[in-house]
């Protein structure tokens, strides 16, 4: 009988997701399913993890991230082998705000991959977890979703959707065996933010952010700001009056 914790990571090739996987496997061998769009990249991640944790069962799934029916089938196939203990929904992209303003297709794509797609995956897993009355759904949002800002409001709008969705899902599952964790990273040193690092931005290490996520998911913490200082920063930004906020170049 397989008593290993069953973990699914959607968007497993993201730097944060990969480091979360490493930390989970360092704790104990697991039954790990890696979901991504690029088969070669997922296999590279899986190969590395198998070396790190030979006793773990690691499988890969190449999947569609935008088509609802394909997402439904992907999740149904994953849960056929048993109830999922943890699903981390980690995929997304960091679009250029100017591109989104000038190109409606780019705008739509940014909203879809950062907002709609994570919600669809979460809802598909929620259906199974509701029946089992067991499991944790962890969604990676962003501090950008806390208040719309001119520098990234399309991305922020998508992540704001994830935030509201997660809040509603938490309300739905309150008092049950299903936990919902909303993760709000600040700017983190990953390939997705390489252009920000080049501009001198202060970025959190991916290792520290992943550590906070894994610890928060284990305890079922409802909201994780990573690093924690972003809770205070975003509380201030959320509560700034418009006449002050509108003068800021952020």
Located regions from the model:
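Active-site loop immediately N-terminal to the catalytic Tyr-X3-Lys motif
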Residues: 147-153
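Active-site helix of classical SDR
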Residues: 122, 158
């Amino acid at each position: 009988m397989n008593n290993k914790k069953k973990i699914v990571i959607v968007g497993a090739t993201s730097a944060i997701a990969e480091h979360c996987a490493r930390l989970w496997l360092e704790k104990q061998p697991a039954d790990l399913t890696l979901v991504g769009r690029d088969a070669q990249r997922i296999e590279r991640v899986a190969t590395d993890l198998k070396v790190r944790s030979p006793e773990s069962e690691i499988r890969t799934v190449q999947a569609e991230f935008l088509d609802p029916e394909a997402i439904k089938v992907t999740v149904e196939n994953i849960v056929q082998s048993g109830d999922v203990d943890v699903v981390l929904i980690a995929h997304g992209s960091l679009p250029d705000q100017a591109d989104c303003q000038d190109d409606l297709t780019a705008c739509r794509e940014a909203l879809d991959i950062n907002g709609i797609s994570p919600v669809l995956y979460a809802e598909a897993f929620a259906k199974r977890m509701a029946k089992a009355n067991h499991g944790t759904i962890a969604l990676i949002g962003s501090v950008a979703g806390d208040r719309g800002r001119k520098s990234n409001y399309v991305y922020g709008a998508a992540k704001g959707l994830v935030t509201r969705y997660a809040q509603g899902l938490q309300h739905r599952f309150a008092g049950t065996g299903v936990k919902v964790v909303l993760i709000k990273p600040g700017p983190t040193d990953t390939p997705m933010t390489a252009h920000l690092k080049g501009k001198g931005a202060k970025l959190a290490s991916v290792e520290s952010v992943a550590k906070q996520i894994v610890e928060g998911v284990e305890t079922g913490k409802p909201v994780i700001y990573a690093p924690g200082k972003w809770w205070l920063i975003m509380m201030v930004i959320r509560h700034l009056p418009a006449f002050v906020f509108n003068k800021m170049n952020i």
